[in-house]
Amino acid sequence: MGKSILVVDDTRSMRKMVVAVLQGAGYEVEEAADGDEAIEKAKKKVFDLVVTDHNMPGTDGVTLVRLLRAISAYDNVAIIVLSTETGAELKAKGREAGATGWMAKPFDPEKMLAIVRQFVD
């Protein structure tokens, strides 16, 4: 079985693009449309990696990182935040919450795969 990745994004088309790239590279991928759904899935299964959007209604990406880190099984799971915002202050908040990486949107599929591979392969 391949490595499992949870993709979290409130925009369906973006979720589908990320999923297509990751599945095309042989990863097992599950989707969540928001932070609440992501937490529910994370409580039932430990993923090898989480890729989450930052700008989501309700639970944003940085808050989701913090909530995932509160689940002991996610202490060492890589979490990458995707965002159109790339400011140093927001990245610092992400790192402080426990984010492993930050990637700008729109993303380059090859760059995404390179980042994903460094954490799960």
Where do the language-model regions lie?
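Charged docking surfaces used in two-component/phosphorelay signaling
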Residues: K16-G24
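Short hydrophobic/Thr-rich beta-strand motif most characteristic of the beta2 strand and flanking loop
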Residues: G26-A33, K41
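Active-site beta3 strand of CheY-like receiver
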Residues: V46-V51
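Active-site residues of response regulator receiver
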Residues: D53, S83
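Receiver (REC) domain active-site loop signature in two-component systems and cognate sites
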Residues: M56
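C-terminal output helix
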Residues: F107-V116
